[in-house]
Amino acid sequence: MKPSIVAKLEALQERHEEVEAMLGDAGVIADQERFRALSREYAQLTDVSQCFRQWQQSQEDIETAEMMLSDAEMRDMAQEELQTARAASEELEQQLQVLLLPKDPDDERNCYLEVRAGTGGDEAAIFAGDLFRMYSRYAESRRWKVEVMSANEGEHGGYKEVIAKVVGEGAYGRLKFESGGHRVQRVPETESQGRIHTSACTVAVMPELPEAELPDINPSDLKIDTFRSSGAGGQHVNTTDSAIRITHLPTGIVVECQDERSQHKNKAKALGVLGSRIRAAEMARRQQEESSTRRNLLGSGDRSDRNRTYNFPQGRVTDHRINLTIYRLDEAMEGKLDALIEPIVQEYQADQLAALSGQD
C-alpha cells in the first residue's frame, strides 16, 4: 500500500480514538446536537478503523512468517502462513480502498421517488403500480417509511404518475441507481390473443435536501395553482382546495402535492420537491458533460436511460448497464432488490477506483 494512503489511514484511526473519547465526555453528552454529529462520525470511522487494524495485523503476520522461513524445520508451515497473510493483506487493501472512496453526502438522506408510466397505455400504468409496490416492499424490508405525496391513478389500475418520499437512513444511496427507464415484457390481462407487449416506465430518485441547501427560487418564477385532492394520497377528497400544483416557469418543472389537509403544508412539501428537482436537473446536466469522458451508471430519470427489462414469460430481470441477468423476477417484484442493487453499487465503486487510479 502507498505510504500516503497508510498515513491517511493512521490519521483516520487517530481521529476514531479521539471521537470515542469525546463521546464519553459529560459536556458532549449534554449537548445533544454535538453528540449526534460525533456519533455519526464515529460510526463512519469505525469500519475503516477496524479494517486498517486488521491490515496492520496482516503486515505483522507477513513479517513473522518471513522471519520463520530461515528455519528449516519451520519453513513449510511458514510458507503456508505467509501465503494466507498475503492473501488477507490483499483483500483488506481492496476493502480499505473502497472505504476511502469519497462519500456522496446525499447518500444517507431521505429521497423522493417518482414513478411515471411511459409508452404502453394502461399496461404501462399497471406496471408503474407494480414498480411502486416493489420499491415500497423494499423500503419496508429496510424499515424505511414511504409517504405518498401525489398520485394520479391509471384507469385500469396502477399509476400514470406517483410521487413519494422515502424516509430512512441511506435511502437515497441505495435507490439512486434506479433512476432511468424500466421496460416490462409480458402478456397484459386485457390481451385476448396471448401476445407479449412491451411497455415502459421512468423512475426518478432525488435526495431530500435540507432547507439550507435548497436552490434559491425566485417567487416570481412560480405559478401556483390549487385544486381538490383526489385518489390515493388525498384521503380528504372534495372538501377544500388544499392540493397544490407549482410550475417553475424557467424550467417548466411541475410539482404537485395533495397528501396533507393543509394547503400551507402541501405548498411547503411541493417546494421541497421542486428544489430537489431543480438541483437534480443541474446535476444531470453536469453528469452528461462528464459522461463524454467516462461511463455514467447514475441515470437521469429520463426514458432514454435504459436501466432494466423485466421479462415475465422468462422470469428474468436484465440490467443493461452492467449486463447482469437474474432469473428471480418474482422475488424482485416482491421487493427483494439487493441482488440487483448490490452489483451496480460495486460496479460504481470500481469505476470510482479506476478514476482515482487514473489521477495518481
Curated annotation (Swiss-Prot):
Keyword Zinc: no
Domain of life where this protein originates: Bacteria
Modified residue annotations for N5-methylglutamine: 235
Post-translational modification: Methylated by PrmC. Methylation increases the termination efficiency of RF1.
Key words, A-Z: Cytoplasm, Methylation, Protein biosynthesis
Assigned GO CC terms: cytoplasm
InterPro entries linked to this entry: PCRF (IPR005139), Pep_chain_release_fac_I (IPR000352), Pep_chain_release_fac_I_sf (IPR045853), Prokaryotic/Mito_RF (IPR050057), RF-1 (IPR004373)
Amino acid composition bias (Basic and acidic residues), ranges on this chain: 284-293
Locations listed in the record: Cytoplasm
SMART domains documented for this protein: PCRF (SM00937)
UniProt family annotation: Belongs to the prokaryotic/mitochondrial release factor family.
Function as written in the Swiss-Prot or TrEMBL entry: Peptide chain release factor 1 directs the termination of translation in response to the peptide chain termination codons UAG and UAA.
Family matches, as NCBIfam families: prfA (TIGR00019), PRK00591.1 (NF001859)
Record protein name field: Peptide chain release factor 1
